[in-house]
Amino acid sequence: MDASPEPPQKGGTLVLVRRQPPVSQGLLETLKARLKKSCTCSMPCAQALVQGLFPVIRWLPQYRLKEYLAGDVMSGLVIGIILVPQAIAYSLLAGLQPIYSLYTSFFANLIYFLMGTSRHVNVGIFSLLCLMVGQVVDRELQLAGFDPSQDSLGPGNNDSTLNNTATLTVGLQDCGRDCHAIRIATALTLMAGLYQVLMGILRLGFVSTYLSQPLLDGFAMGASVTILTSQAKHLLGVRIPRHQGLGMVIHTWLSLLQNVGQANLCDVVTSAVCLAVLLTAKELSDRYRHYLKVPVPTELLVIVVATIASHFGQLHTRFGSSVAGNIPTGFVAPQIPDPKIMWSVALDAMSLALVGSAFSISLAEMFARSHGYSVSANQELLAVGCCNVLPAFFHCFATSAALSKTLVKIATGCQTQLSSVVSAAVVLLVLLVLAPLFHDLQRCVLACIIVVSLRGALRKVKDLPQLWRLSPADALVWVATAATCVLVSIEAGLLAGVFFSLLSLAGRTQRPRAALLARIGDSTFYEDAAEFEGLLPPPEVRVFRFTGPLYYANKDFFLRSLYSLTGLDAGYSATRKDRGTEVGVSNRSLVDRKDLGSVSSGDGLVVPLAFGFHTVVIDCAPLLFLDVAGMATLKDLRKNYRALDITLLLACCSPSVRDTLRKGGFLGEDQGTAEELLFPSVHSAVETACARREELMAADSAL
């Protein structure tokens, strides 16, 4: 047990503080205990397992009917009304028929109602995931021999439209473009859902936390630009080939500029009117949202008016304007996704699963904190995974939590996930009765709805200057992620964001701040001598602070910083002393840190016999951990200082650092060594060092 060498005093009474050593359990014993706990079969365990998988069993019996029902019904109706036009519009992004978007919205709401732990999050179609699904669908369609420029929506698209020079993939002779497109989407969705379920079973909910907020914001920004680019041709009514792969955004805009003369005047006018109405309505809603009890369903009103105008104006027949086409009613028979396609899209499903999980967990945790309850990240993975796995057999594609609809749910009084059942009922009504009424809806109107929904993500670019002032490293992650999404691809943008995030993290720990500390007046506190004026440096003692972990990547910087600030290269000087060469001290300022990165062993450091200090105290409070290289660095440092008759002391070590020091052999086997080297505070270490020095000087004087 560790004991403080100088126990604190309280009211003149000494208080002895001893540390209870941690009881370490071996890996095999830990695995056995967890396996035994997991495999125990009893009624309470089975009940807990079922309640964990289906949280609705726990909260539904406690539902406060009078308090919650009105808000849940209202928010469910509003979200259902918003879902219908968004589902039809987002089918453009996914390259699928609108009916499949409605299926997806219906099943996702029901499954998350049963399995979700968040009371407010809305899980359903999400623009970024729709874009990622659409890119995979387009690529696989082209590989299968279908014309990539053929759109999914519109009349006559259920026919097999093939390239003249392409060879039809075996087994596709009886399956048209739309049939094969939904096969690809369901296979991709099933694989992504299986990844998410597997992550939930393995308790890997923490993995999504490695996708930082700047990364997600930059990814949303880059993906929004890509979505805007993909919808530009629908806004103008221009038919251009679908571009894939490297530089898709640039190639698409070049094709648009080359074919802008072929724009459909009817689509251009309709797009201009719809954009003006939607943007104006959104701005007014944002400005006066405190006065509106229920958000105005602008998208639905625009769709209704546009559909009526297109039908009675015969815009498709007279002006060649592209329309949604036939949207069937009812449900189709379930179908098992094609295993061959699943293997071909397995890699794409990984990025899809990671993005969907990250957005879902981050939104669930954010709204749980703001409303005073907790969510389970692992259960969220299972819930979102099941929202992908089960609906994949019913012609649905990937889903995740969506911020905009979640905000609407909260604003309209949502209290529990019962509102999702109401939303599913609204979608079901459209599926069974109202879907054919959208036959004459122009695709440019759907594109306008998608573009306007990107306002929030595109506005995040205004936050970049503030992010740069706050953290240049985070701003670099934001820019790198967004730029790679736009210039290369969505998947490459995600990888670039993760890479730069890890690089930023490594950079921050590789070169942390280092400083010499001095005493604040007569207090027991010490601060950076270069940052504050009027501090009192302890006589003949150097107090060094390193604000980061000590590990293999920064051990050299640790030594360079220490040697530069103290003016003594201990390794170089100890070697010269062993060789019998006179050593001296540098005349460099002890707090000058301008060349911390350029100081190397022996470069301009001349050390005399009188070093100006007899003890070095390292403030280990910011020292998070030590690895093998860090332990070896401390051992060598103590050895070199000892050769120069300088004492090395450590202060404010955390229990984990103390354990590492003991296991690494830094403290030795006896308790006395720890009490001589480790101190509970910087001040106690400094006072002990000064007291020991005075005792030695007194002993020398007596001799």
From Swiss-Prot:
SUPFAM superfamilies attached to this UniProt entry: SpoIIaa-like
- Residues with the Phosphothreonine modification: 13
* Molecular function terms from GO: bicarbonate transmembrane transporter activity; chloride transmembrane transporter activity; oxalate transmembrane transporter activity; solute:inorganic anion antiporter activity; sulfate transmembrane transporter activity; sulfate:bicarbonate antiporter activity
**Any stretches that span the bilayer, and where are they?**
68-90, 94-116, 184-206, 260-279, 291-313, 346-368, 381-403, 416-438, 476-498
Report the Pfam families cross-referenced here: STAS (PF01740), Sulfate_transp (PF00916)
- Tell me, in a sentence or two, what this protein's role is: Sodium-independent sulfate anion transporter. Can transport other anions including thiosulfate, bicarbonate and oxalate by mediating sulfate-oxalate, sulfate-bicarbonate, sulfate-thiosulfate and oxalate-bicarbonate anion exchange.
Q: What is this protein called?
A: Sulfate anion transporter 1
